Amino acid sequence: MPIITLPDGSQRQFAHAVSVMDVAADIGPGLAKACIAGRVNGELVDACELIEADASLAIITAKDEEGLDILRHSCAHLLGHAIKQLWPQTKMAIGPVIDNGFYYDIDLDRTLTDEDLAALEERMLALAAKDYDVIKKKVSWQEARDVFEARGETYKVEILDQNIARDDQPGLYHHEEYIDMCRGPHVPNMRHCHHFKLQKMSGAYWRGDSNNKMLQRIYGTAWADKKQLKSYLQRLEEAAKRDHRKIGKQLDLYHMQEEAPGMVFWHNDGWTIFRELETFIRGKLKEYDYQEVKGPFMMDRVLWERSGHWEKYAQAMFTTQSENREYAIKPMNCPGHVQIFNQGLKSYRDLPLRMAEFGSCHRNEPSGSLHGLMRVRGFTQDDAHIFCTEEQIMEEVSACIRMVYDVYGTFGFENIVVKLSTRPEQRIGSDEAWDRAEAALAEALVLNGLKYDLQPGEGAFYGPKIEFTLHDCLDRAWQCGTVQLDFALPGRLGATYVGEDNERHVPVMIHRAILGSLERFIGILTEEYAGLFPTWLAPTQAVVMNITDNQADYAVKVAKALNDAGLRAKADLRNEKIGFKIREHTLKRVPFMLVCGDKEVEAGKIAVRTRKGADLGTYPVEELIALLTQEVQTRGQKKVEE
């Protein structure tokens, strides 16, 4: 007679074993209809799972995040069902859930087209409309292997042979005549899978290994209802308009080319944004009392072996040889900063020592993962390392947190998710040291009034960390900032200081990044602002335009006055209609368009328009310079009204 305890603490007693679905039906028909799966004693299970003893149970529906993942996974099976009906010769590989959707890798003797994708989606809709039951059967390893071998599913057989223990009982999910294999759970009926969209196709090597066969990957998205699907597709459409690669080309910010994959060719306007970001962060470094240093971008393999990076990052490092020595181009800055710390005897009085660098790093990322500015091989980190005592951790981490929010707030990012990752099973250092370190990070977060998600076991082996994830205007997540404690690297590289007891001690090292990589952050900003960079970041802040040749000299004079005041301005003297000029510079996202006709020349003024189409009237030139300068210097805190 199992007693089922529900999330609200209420209990229900049954005279015999019951399934998750039985319990949902006992609560009410509405919940039974919505039930996708259950969480029994903390473990996700199918709705058909029998509960034979007392247990806690949460009914999972599509409104739950877990329910949405289950729904998406079942849509991957639905895709497999449709593929096998249209092209029975297809061999199915894997079909996992990803952010906002799913994909399936398939081996087919023809290349799929956009028309095929449309046909697949149509067949999926027709199958889902049948609202058929999904039947789960747990079978022996051998029985599962026999099923897929008989169907010619060589990839499923390989998964069984290489990834599933012989004493395991794989779950086979029956979608009418189609069978797929999965640990589950999956939806009990396809009525839950009506709101999906196939999106695109790409190539993917089997098991991600370029030595294996190239498969075809089909991507899709799935949601709980029509409204959610429509909203997501609208966000995708908006994201496409904001694509930094597209805007970067329109605004002539940068380019990339095949001869230097993953490396950025910055053009003048893009480099202007880059340097403004550097200047901004450099000002914050001074405000928060950092030293700025510069380390070499290439060091001997011996140093990377001592730091431990050679063992863990060798495949991602670019190397070269000279005079029988092997060198590696740095993938990160920390070992170099320890070398700078090691120059000269350090006392406890010298701590905390805060060391920052705009470090040029390189990582040999797989070519298939490269994506504009978001994923590159050559990048610049706004990296810092703080050497301190254990007693100083909380105060230093708290200052890092304040700096992170100070910087993000300037760019208008307010939705920031904070995660605290604690000790993993495999780690160095004593439990007491980890206790103190984790407590210091948690205390610093609380001190700054921040809520955080705890991620047990997700810290690095050398220390706990805090992660800061930005959510942009399209609610996409970008993990940028980190504050990471390191008990290992200083000791490995011989960093010590003399304590009050006149003994040598190894300092604690705090790795701190805010923007992460400047290249990636510029990509994020480009999409967040849709290219409408705030005035202080805009490559060209104002364009002065004459109406006729009579005002050309005056336009040049005004542009010079703006530039002399430290603003970035140009004069557009082309013999074009003023409306044409305004439209062109609006498309270039120039914040202010300054127009001068005979009236403005005579009055010593300038007519001001914004890129958003607002007519701000006429201003004396000196007054406008003062207003624009104030907006730039305050980084948008005091705006010229748009």
UniProtKB/Swiss-Prot annotation:
Residues 1-61 form the TGS domain. Gene3D superfamilies: 3.10.20.30, 3.30.54.20, Anticodon-binding domain, Bira Bifunctional Protein, Domain 2, Threonyl-trna Synthetase, Chain A, domain 2. It is found in: Cytoplasm. It comes from the Bacteria. Homodimer. Zn(2+) binds at residues 334, 385, 511. This is Threonine--tRNA ligase. It comes from Aeromonas hydrophila subsp. hydrophila (strain ATCC 7966 / DSM 30187 / BCRC 13018 / CCUG 14551 / JCM 1027 / KCTC 2358 / NCIMB 9240 / NCTC 8049). PANTHER family: THREONINE--TRNA LIGASE, CHLOROPLASTIC_MITOCHONDRIAL 2, THREONINE-TRNA LIGASE.
